[in-house]
Swiss-Prot record:
GO MF term set: ribosome binding; translation initiation factor activity
Pfam families: IF3_C, IF3_N
Any GO CC annotation of this UniProt entry: cytosol
Protein's name according to its UniProt entry: Translation initiation factor IF-3
Stored SUPFAM superfamilies: Translation initiation factor IF3, C-terminal domain, Translation initiation factor IF3, N-terminal domain
Family in the record: Belongs to the IF-3 family.
Length: 179
């Protein structure tokens, strides 16, 4: 069985314009933003055509609000606003640094430098220690390593989540200090 598709169906993301507006009357706003009152849709379309512009449905109230404007310019401005809003959103990712409960000092320093680099870039850092075999019985050693790591990064980071066990792993969450 084939599905019927409505060819005349308007894309929901784009506002309805010109002939796609099915209301009998619209509350009309002029090209300069002035209120022109409630007018029949056919008359509003003629006014828009006389100005070589489009009639765009702004709000679907009772009666619907339509504005005479240049549709391509309107869509360009909308896309521009969306891009600006997207730029202003801060993208924070979580980077992971894996340690061992019996980590050597040189390895610890390397992981510390790596974590500081992530924090300075503005990313959060998740520090994890995996306990293998019988090391699970020495969780205090892992907690000491975590505390040492948190202490070493206190100038560039704040502890967002204290060290806690989850199965055979211990986690610590660090967030960059806001400037």
């Amino acid at each position: 069985m084939r599905r019927r598709t409505n060819i005349a169906k308007q894309d929901n993301r784009k506002p309805m314009m010109n002939g796609a507006i099915r209301a009998r009357e619209v509350r009309l706003i002029g090209a300069e933003g002035e209120q022109l009152g409630v007018t029949p849709t056919s008359e509003a379309l003629m006014q828009a055509e006389n100005l070589n512009m489009d009639l765009v449905l702004i709000s679907n109230q009772e009666p619907p609000v339509a504005k005479i404007m240049d549709y391509t310019k309107f869509m360009f401005e909308q896309k521009k606003k969306q891009k600006e809003a997207k730029k202003k959103q801060a993208v924070v990712s979580v980077k992971e640094v894996r340690l061992s409960p019996v980590i050597d000092q040189n390895d610890f320093d390397t992981k510390l430098r790596q974590a500081i680099k992530f924090l300075e870039k503005g990313d959060k850092v998740k520090v994890s220690i995996r306990f293998k075999g019988r090391m699970i019985t020495h969780q205090d050693v892992g907690r000491q390593v975590m505390d040492k790591f948190a202490q070493a990064t206190k100038e560039v980071a704040v502890v967002e989540q204290r060290a806690k066990m989850d199965g055979r792993q211990m986690f610590l969450q660090l967030a960059p200090i806001k400037k």
